[in-house]
UniProtKB/Swiss-Prot annotation:
Record keywords, A-Z: Ribonucleoprotein, Ribosomal protein
Source organism per UniProt: Listeria welshimeri serovar 6b (strain ATCC 35897 / DSM 20650 / CCUG 15529 / CIP 8149 / NCTC 11857 / SLCC 5334 / V8)
GO biological process: translation
Superkingdom classification of source: Bacteria
GO cellular component labels: ribonucleoprotein complex; ribosome
Protein name: Large ribosomal subunit protein bL31B
Keyword Secreted attached: no
Keyword Transcription regulation set for record: no
Signal sequence residues: none
Subunit structure: Part of the 50S ribosomal subunit.
Any GO molecular function: structural constituent of ribosome
Stated family: Belongs to the bacterial ribosomal protein bL31 family. Type B subfamily.
Gene: rpmE2
HAMAP family xref list: Ribosomal_bL31_2
Amino acid sequence: MKTGIHPEYRQVVFVDTSTDFKFLSGSTKSSSETIKWEDGNEYPLLRVEISSDSHPFYTGKQKHATADGRVDRFNKKYGLKDANAAK
C-alpha cells in the first residue's frame, strides 16, 4: 500500500444532539473538539443530529404511510364501490 494516502482510522465519540446520547465508535472523520470518555481517555467528539437513539425506525415511533393503489384512487374519484365487495 502507498503511504500517506489513507485516512487515519481512530476511535471517536459521537453525540446525538437531540437526545444527548453518546457512543464510542471507530471513524476516519476528524474533529477539533474532544471529550473525556468513561474509560478515562480523551477522544475526538463528533456531533450528529440523528442516531439509533433518536431515529424513528429504532425507537418504534415511526409512521406508516398508506399509499392507495391506482384502482383505489380511480374508484374514489368516480364514486365507484369496491367491485370485490359486490360479488
